[in-house]
């Protein structure tokens, strides 16, 4: 290990010591380093970094206290001797090959450049199935539609099918329109957030406005056409902002859910926010009582906010009364986290919930009781998300940690098993926001979904992590969107509800993609193509509506408010081969 790696290792340890032996590590920079170095480190073991530090010979302050008595004279290691004498001990790092997957010596597994090398004692990292193949030669990597049963035309054998054909399919065009892939990077806001981006949402009426949340609880509003018009609200939540929904009757009112256990409503015009629900009124009393909120959706018919916590309970909020209705209802295994909620767009009383108890469940919110789910959809591992199709609500799309995207074509049919399972790389580690496959809200055929990819690909010597557009009816990969200027992973992706635009969140940055036209393709062949980026956040608002000057220093997340710092505009140019440079 070279001196650069050793210096970073020592710096991380020193920073942890200053904050105290029991403080959680500040992984702001560690997250971005993890993403940028994902092509050179294994992703299978989440705790390898700490394990390597302990095995390197460095001992924490508490480790030297417990030692069993022995009849023989105790041998004192150089590290312990140096600690007792107050001197700094040298760090010894072993160069022996150790597999981070099976912990055995003699071989290694993980990313080598842009190629993932499998552990010979484990199944394929992509499909999780034994079969003598590796991730590089996995048939699902060669062709994503491998083993997928395409959707077939339904036979109208029952009266319910006749109703479905006439009322629903009659509104869907028989000829599938050409889908425009937003595959050209239009602009980006570099390091807009101080922590990694966790959620994105387009404004329901202002086409050019994008809202984003991050791990620190900060809410950002950005006009990506005017580039420099952006506002951040830094006092809405105190930690991870997991979900946000607009009020259907007031497009200036936004509801947000956070891991601090609160639901807040923010007036985007005035910047004034108010708390609707607080599941931790007594503050932090340990992880056994601390409740976090991940899933949230809005029932527009009844004006209800549906909120699910990390203990498996569902809470109903009346937005008009700003009060909780009834008692919490257990909808998933007690003590398990509910990861997402989604109301059916055609029948809002039908609710789809997903959890880390390996199930997605369908409920009738008019008759909510424990163990009263219509059906429980079993999965192999944690279910990151579940969504009804955006037009008819008759399909279900789920994303599971077993590297499977599951599709149910008809919610009134047999739901014992999915209509198809699509193998896709989205099994992530602790430094990433969970991947979630989402429908394209503009697609009337209800077949197109978008999701980021974890395993990197080698594009002209650069390790890139594409954003995949998938045909859920066949499992076919429609397009993989990437740019040589973006080498980090993009787990958060949102398609515009009206325009052919894709927004992606990668680390602390946000990017906007648009379809590449024929004129753009001709222009790119003749000359270099320029893209505009904006660095740093601009105006910042507190929850009381007052503006505050922002700082672009993300080391401590503080802002001095003394001098307004303008966002820096950078123009990136790159050739067809992907070798880029920046001009300020």
Curated annotation (Swiss-Prot):
Residues 517-532 have a biased composition (Basic and acidic residues). It is found in: Nucleus. Residues 1-87, 517-584 are annotated as: Disordered. One of its GO terms (cellular component) is nucleus. PROSITE patterns: WD_REPEATS_1 (PS00678), WD_REPEATS_2 (PS50082), WD_REPEATS_REGION (PS50294). InterPro entries: DDB2, WD40/YVTN_repeat-like_dom_sf, WD40_repeat_CS, WD40_repeat_dom_sf, WD40_rpt. It holds the Pfam family WD40. One of its GO terms (molecular function) is damaged DNA binding. Keywords: DNA damage, DNA repair, DNA-binding, Metal-binding, Nucleus, Repeat, Ubl conjugation pathway, WD repeat, Zinc, Zinc-finger. A zinc finger (CCHC-type) spans 122-140. Signal peptide: none annotated. A motif (DWD box) lies at residues 351-366. Residues 8-20, 562-584 have a biased composition (Basic residues). Required for DNA repair. Binds to DDB1 to form the UV-damaged DNA-binding protein complex (the UV-DDB complex). The UV-DDB complex may recognize UV-induced DNA damage and recruit proteins of the nucleotide excision repair pathway (the NER pathway) to initiate DNA repair. May function as the substrate recognition module for a DCX (DDB1-CUL4-X-box) E3 ubiquitin-protein ligase complex. Component of the UV-DDB complex, which is composed of DDB1 and DDB2. Belongs to the WD repeat DDB2/WDR76 family. PANTHER family: DAMAGE-SPECIFIC DNA BINDING PROTEIN 2, DNA DAMAGE-BINDING PROTEIN 2. This is DNA damage-binding protein 2. It comes from Oryza sativa subsp. japonica (Rice). The lineage of its organism: Eukaryota, Viridiplantae, Streptophyta, Embryophyta, Tracheophyta. The gene is DDB2.
